[in-house]
Amino acid sequence: RPFRKHGAVPLSTYMRIYKKGDIVDIKGMGTIQ
């Protein structure tokens, strides 16, 4: 998961992705794109 490469993801979003996993992973991808 190349989330670190983007670098545009806020820590709060990253932490949510790390905690919830796939569910918030979708929201994270939506934020990046």
Curated annotation (Swiss-Prot):
InterPro entries: Ribosomal_eL21, Ribosomal_eL21_sf, Translation_prot_SH3-like_sf. GO terms for biological process: translation. GO terms for molecular function: structural constituent of ribosome. It is found in: Cytoplasm, Cytosol; Cytoplasm; Endoplasmic reticulum. Gene3D superfamilies: Ribosomal protein L21. Its main location: cytoplasm. One of its GO terms (cellular component) is cytosol. Signal peptide: none annotated. The keyword Endoplasmic reticulum applies. Pfam families: Ribosomal_L21e. Keywords: Cytoplasm, Endoplasmic reticulum, Ribonucleoprotein, Ribosomal protein. It comes from the Eukaryota. Belongs to the eukaryotic ribosomal protein eL21 family. Component of the large ribosomal subunit. Component of the large ribosomal subunit. The ribosome is a large ribonucleoprotein complex responsible for the synthesis of proteins in the cell. This is Large ribosomal subunit protein eL21.
